[in-house]
């Protein structure tokens, strides 16, 4: 079996959860497909398949055969370098082999190619790179039919259909008021009561406006299933057909005919269209987080090509291109500064409002803002490989994934419509044969009400819209959930295990204390200690040097250096003999240091690493270095405790140092002296105690523990491997994000339960009420139209969480 692949596709044409279930079932039956996940709210399909047995084209064809449409983008290119038809053939074959490309016909005569591709799998830069390798050049003409444009076009179409339907339905609604005693005083033009006039108004609504429902119903029935389209088409057709029968019966009579239901079918369709339009707009708002992230992306870049500056679309930037960035511009790609100095606003990544200084050799992140200087940047990551693209991809995957809680809704949705059809038929028979014997009008009215009040959409949207809104809002806080499953599991956590270095602490030692002794001043102590450390590459030595430089002190030139493993340094600088190290070093070199031991032990009790310093054989004092806790750690730990969580710090440090750091951070429980390879075992031990555990870390040695924990959280300032292993990435490196993630998970799960309760409760109560005859069909239709809207609007409340 070859290595499996995963493909994501945008699918249009789904109207309810039954549609999503049908596509999912159809895809899972395909040879070579091992799993398929179809999400109604995001209108996406994620398929895992064996490329040896099937491919993108076959999967797309299957979705089309089921009666739905895979949304693709088209990009038209001019081709440079073709000399014959064989060139065109080579380019066409190469483009069609790219994952996500549906079709790429090359026109040799016009020297153009129009590529139809899945934007979730391929990009313009992928297409260009593939053709570049063949020795040709693609030049973008312009893209059409993007997903956003297609959705706007569909929204405009829905609005136009709604207006057309409302204009024709209004006279029918006006005529309907004459049916009720309490509205009989309202004047109604006689023409509106004429059955043939009502027929003329209702027919375009039924067959022009209602046509998509007929098409959807036909496709569903052809595939031996049923969906909301079947219910709407059947219910409105029953009302229309019965009214048409009575209209023909009225031939030869004068005036209006009682018992017509033209207004029922027309108003039903109008209300359903109104509900669908609201739903579309609300669902669009649920992906606001993605839109905000995409707006951060630069649209163009200034590059040097053939010795000249050129402004090109961002998709055309290649790795190793030199990009010019002026003050105030967004940096278009991830790269390295090769020339220039500036301050860069990285708040979109780190959440920090203060700009960060950038010099030659420093890395920069695409979509951050160059504040005040001119920069030349060498492109390192472009297109879908940039940090922002990765963030967008993670959010999209999370919004398109299913949470385990959705399984119940999926199971119900799969059998919902057939059950409703059965109840509707039974309702008709009971009313026609028993409740109102022989009264066809009464029975058909109850039959229609049952059909149109049932709403599988509300059930299908209950979970995914909340997942979309919750994960999207979390992303705005710098919290990236890798999927709906992790968003759900996070709310069950009761224990948070924090790695010390880089998580609770800054991960970078700094000079904290300098205590001179005897005739020496602090300046002497620091200058000569730093001079000795210039020959060392130890992080503690680097911390001393950085601290001395920050104080503006000059460091004498080192003339001799010798490292004593496990003890310290022997050095000469500025004509002085210097020792920097442990008690053991001072004892071996016979330097009297007893008067410093009490202070040394005090500092060590605070979790600091203390080094004794001697100059020319005389104790000069001591310097202390510590990996200090982050400014936000204490507050973050307090927030976690307020949420009812048990907080544990895990570290490889000795217990004394660990206790000092834990005390400063407000952490009561510690696991100290743990080797990197033992961290996962400690997590497993906590799980055996019945704890739902999260591990939070930032380093390579945290990866096994992150994978073992129920939820692994990676601090975004850490290593790529930790972030790859984790279920949640906290891109701001702030421990407060842990509490935010847990709170967001709890609020999202609460929102999902509210939605499921509403959707299940609505259908459980609405269908019997309609069957008992307490609802007119048009009222039932209005309830159905707005039930799914209410679910989406409730989910959107998550976007306002602060």
UniProtKB/Swiss-Prot annotation:
GO molecular function: ATP binding; ATP hydrolysis activity; copper ion binding; identical protein binding; P-type divalent copper transporter activity; P-type monovalent copper transporter activity
Residues that hold Cu(+) 2 according to the record: 84, 87
PROSITE patterns referenced in this protein's UniProt entry, alphabetically: ATPASE_E1_E2, HMA_1, HMA_2
Keywords (A to Z) from UniProt: ATP-binding, Cell membrane, Copper, Copper transport, Ion transport, Magnesium, Membrane, Metal-binding, Nucleotide-binding, Phosphoprotein, Repeat, Translocase, Transmembrane, Transmembrane helix, Transport
Transmembrane domains' residue ranges: 162-181, 196-218, 230-249, 259-278, 412-434, 447-469, 756-775, 779-796
EC number: 7.2.2.8
Pfam families to which the protein is assigned, alphabetical: E1-E2_ATPase (PF00122), HMA (PF00403), Hydrolase (PF00702)
Active-site residues, record numbering mapped to chain: 499
Entry binding sites for Mg(2+): 698, 702
GO biological process, one term: copper ion homeostasis
Domain of life: Bacteria
Keyword set includes Ribosomal protein: no
Domain HMA, chain residue ranges per copy: 5-71, 73-139
Induction section of the entry: By Cu(2+).
Disulfide cysteine pairs (residue numbers): none
Note: The copZA operon is activated by CueR and indirectly repressed by YfmP.
Function, in words: Involved in copper export.
Entry similarity comment: Belongs to the cation transport ATPase (P-type) (TC 3.A.3) family. Type IB subfamily.
NCBIfam families the UniProt entry points to: ATPase-IB1_Cu, ATPase-IB_hvy, ATPase_P-type, copper ion binding protein
Entry protein name: Copper-exporting P-type ATPase
């Amino acid at each position: 079996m070859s290595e499996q692949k995963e493909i994501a596709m945008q699918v249009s044409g789904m109207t309810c959860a039954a549609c999503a279930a049908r596509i999912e079932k159809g895809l899972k039956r395909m040879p070579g497909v091992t799993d398929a996940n179809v999400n109604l709210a995001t209108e996406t399909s994620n398929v895992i398949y064996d490329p040896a047995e099937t491919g993108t084209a076959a999967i797309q064809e299957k979705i089309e055969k089921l009666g739905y449409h895979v949304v693709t983008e088209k990009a038209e290119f001019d081709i440079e370098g073709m000399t014959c038809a064989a060139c065109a053939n080579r380019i066409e074959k190469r483009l069609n082999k790219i994952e996500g490309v549906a079709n790429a016909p090359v026109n040799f005569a016009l020297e153009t190619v129009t590529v139809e591709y899945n934007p979730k799998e391929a990009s313009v830069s992928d297409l260009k790179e593939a053709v570049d390798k063949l020795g040709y050049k693609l030049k973008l003409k312009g893209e059409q039919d993007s997903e956003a444009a297609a959705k706007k076009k569909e929204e405009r179409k829905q609005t136009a259909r709604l207006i057309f339907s409302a204009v024709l339905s209004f006279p029918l609604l006006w005529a309907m008021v004459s049916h009720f005693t309490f509205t009989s005083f309202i004047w109604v033009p006689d023409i509106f009561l004429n059955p043939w006039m009502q027929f003329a108004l209702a027919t375009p609504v039924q067959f022009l406006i209602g046509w998509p429902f007929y098409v959807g119903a036909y496709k569903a029935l052809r595939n031996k299933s049923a969906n909301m389209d079947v219910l709407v088409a059947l219910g409105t057709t029953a009302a229309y057909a019965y009214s048409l029968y009575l209209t023909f019966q009225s031939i030869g009579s004068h005036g209006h005919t009682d018992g017509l239901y033209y207004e029922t079918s027309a108003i039903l369709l109008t209300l359903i269209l109104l509900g669908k339009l609201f739903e579309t707009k609300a669902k669009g708002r649920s992906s606001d987080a993605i839109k905000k992230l995409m707006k951060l992306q630069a649209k163009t870049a200034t590059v040097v090509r053939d010795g000249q500056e050129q402004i090109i679309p961002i998709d055309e930037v290649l790795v190793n291109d030199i990009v010019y960035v002026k003050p105030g511009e967004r940096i278009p790609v991830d790269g390295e500064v090769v020339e220039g100095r500036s301050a860069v606003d990285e708040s979109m990544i780190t959440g920090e409002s203060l700009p960060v200084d950038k010099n030659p050799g420093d890395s920069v992140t695409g979509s951050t803002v160059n504040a005040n200087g001119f920069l030349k940047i060498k492109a390192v990551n472009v297109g879908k490989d940039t940090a922002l693209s990765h963030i967008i991809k993670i959010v999209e995957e999370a919004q398109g994934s299913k949470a385990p809680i959705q399984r119940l809704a999926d199971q119900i949705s799969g059998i919902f419509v057939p059950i409703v059809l059965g109840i509707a038929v039974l309702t008709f028979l009971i009313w026609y044969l028993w409740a109102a014997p022989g009264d066809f009008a009464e029975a058909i009215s109850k039959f229609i009400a049952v059909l149109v009040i049932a709403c599988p959409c509300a059930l299908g949207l209950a979970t995914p819209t909340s997942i979309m809104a919750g994960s999207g809002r979390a992303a705005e806080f710098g919290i990236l959930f890798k999927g709906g499953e992790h968003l759900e599991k996070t709310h069950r956590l009761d224990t948070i295990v924090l790695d010390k270095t880089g998580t609770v602490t800054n991960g970078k030692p700094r000079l904290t204390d300098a205590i001179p002794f005897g005739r020496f001043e602090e300046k002497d102590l620091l200058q000569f200690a730093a001079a000795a450390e210039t020959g060392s590459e130890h992080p503690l030595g680097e911390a001393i040097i950085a601290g001395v430089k920050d104080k503006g002190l000059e460091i004498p030139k080192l003339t001799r250096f010798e490292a004593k493993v496990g003890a310290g340094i022997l050095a000469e600088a500025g004509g002085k003999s210097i020792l920097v190290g442990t008690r053991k070093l001072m004892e071996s070199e016979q330097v009297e240091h007893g008067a410093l031991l009490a202070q040394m032990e005090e500092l060590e009790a605070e979790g600091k690493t203390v080094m004794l310093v001697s100059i020319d054989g005389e104790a000069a004092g001591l310097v202390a270095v510590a990996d200090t806790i982050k400014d936000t750690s204490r507050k973050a730990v307090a927030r976690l405790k307020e949420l009812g969580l048990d907080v544990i710090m895990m570290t490889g440090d000795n217990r004394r140092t660990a206790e000092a750091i834990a005390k400063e951070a407000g952490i009561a429980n510690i696991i100290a002296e743990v080797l990197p390879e033992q961290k996962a075992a400690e997590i497993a031990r906590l799980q055996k105690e019945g704890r739902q555990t999260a591990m939070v870390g930032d380093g390579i040695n945290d990866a096994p523990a992150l994978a073992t924990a129920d939820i692994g959280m990676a601090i975004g300032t850490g290593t790529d491997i930790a972030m790859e292993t984790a279920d949640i990435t906290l891109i701001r490196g702030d421990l407060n994000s842990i509490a935010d993630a847990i709170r967001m998970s709890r609020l999202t799960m609460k929102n999902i339960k509210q939605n499921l309760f509403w959707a299940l409760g609505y259908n459980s109560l609405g269908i019997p009420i309609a069957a008992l005859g307490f609802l007119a069909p048009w009222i039932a239709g209005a309830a159905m139209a707005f039930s799914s809207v209410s679910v989406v609007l409730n989910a959107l409340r998550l976007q306002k969480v602060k």
